[in-house]
């Protein structure tokens, strides 16, 4: 019996999305693009090799997430990062975009270096996770087949297909208020308001879509046009949104890992996500205020708030970047403690996919992409720790 056909059949039966078009392009070709080198195109749990199936599923999902993060950070690096190519981690840098870099430097003079380093880190994460999976003869994750979204046309950006869309974002900034709360915790059912309300409505671009949106302006106190500065401010808060997600996700999925070495991997990589988030949390608070900025595409007129006016309000004050002690596990039983939040493990992977989707990162993506990503997330959420 042909074992590969048997495994494909089992996965088609297990996942309804496999019945609705993914196989139409040919299992061998498309499957290789989806899962990389492994036992077969659509290996089910049997593709865990020498790993516990749950551990393999967690690592495979995180490898996919890191590819998504690497893709978006690559776009930021091309336009706004330090322009030193460091193959294989960072390539394709052609000089950046002077106006966008200037606008980012208004948040912090070291922003280009931080962007460069964050990009390098995410590349290393996805490379390591797939390499580890392969070393255990487990299926890997490879999303290259879905690099079909358009690039920015501004100077500095490569004209290549992308996994993510940074030009139609609706950014959740509730992480700002969540980490300042002394009484509330999302794991206990609490909700939080967006700190920068304008970013949580409509669609915003975090990179210049073209050179008209990336302009130096010596007459402006920021040295760039208000449109360019607004885009950089948006990026500053998006950086933190992405990395606070990773901060929680690794802690959430670590609770499902079985093998000590897999747990070590999750804790070790997760710690770097925390460092990223702390950095971007600090820099976002330096965003210059702006009034009456007109989006060249949507025509919307928007303001960016003066964050310095948050001073004295402990729910919003910019320099309160250390996690405030808050309720944990049980509000009545235990005192407040400074923690990462959320860390509830139930449906953590599916929650991460939803957050990315709500953010607008995948606007324009193929339906097969969503089916695959949700399938990987479901597998990760089904993992159970074994002792």
Regions found by a protein language model. Give the residues of each.
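All-alpha RGS (Regulator of G-protein Signaling) helical domain and cognate RGS-like helical scaffolds
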Residues: 2-8, 19-26, 35, 40-387
